[in-house]
């Protein structure tokens, strides 16, 4: 295990999102099954925490940007700052939708089409953000997710308002199309990992990378698909499973996504105005972490070294012997011990 390599590519933004979604996905089925009787405003607490950190990070980053004009010329600082502003705009629209959902569930006074209105606006904004992101080589997971699901948002809102009376299996047709594409991606990674395993011209590091990617995609997509199928059957009345058991596959997918954030490069350096990698920022604030971060463990390598030391022990080192009169240093070789020659006195004639 190499902690330095583990945290060097850590993406704190995605880790925060997946952690908040995991906690929310635990509280929501507990509330739906009646295990807890909290208000939905409290159930959505992880979502409020997520949005609060986004707004706080953007505010601090904007303040650092405004007070230090010299920072704007550092590499791609301008591009990253614009990407942060786009992300904040999308998060604000999502926050409006989540507030309207809580208000609709608690009071039930307005139509679901009005509740989904922020999502109808976020989709074209996400399309524009995707175009801008492709031009500047930016990460686009959230933007792509919001842009491709516009039809799904419309179907769900119409079904909740009973404008259409389709079964939920039909309502989620856009989602099935998206999941079919993700299944093709999983199949692609599986095939490539098998080809790399059978190839003799590929180094072991590349084989491990492709196998790891295939396993990650399988543990993300397959449980997610199982969760969606169980949820649709529960909404249509084909099964009476508890919501807790239905959400278990989703927890597995989110935990896998959290694990992948430790090996994913990226992340905007302008959140909270840190302007550097999150790992370097933590090491500057907490210097004692460097002692752990500079340690690497390789048990297999240590075992091989122990075997080599056991098979070929090092010859003992013998201290050098010094002559008192001649002041000559005699260093003995690591072979057989040979005594020095006897002292010879030469008498000079008068």
Curated annotation (Swiss-Prot):
GO terms under cellular component: membrane
Membrane topology designation: Multi-pass membrane protein
Keywords: Membrane, Transmembrane, Transmembrane helix
InterPro entries, per database record: TM_Fragile-X-F-assoc
Membrane in keyword set: yes
Highest taxon, organism lineage: Eukaryota
Annotated localization: Membrane
Transmembrane annotation, as ranges: 16-36, 41-61, 81-101, 111-131, 168-188, 211-231, 240-260
Pfam families from the UniProt entry: Tmemb_185A
Keyword field contains Transmembrane helix: yes
Similarity comment text for this entry: Belongs to the TMEM185 family.
Name this polypeptide is given: Transmembrane protein 185B
Organism annotation: Bos taurus
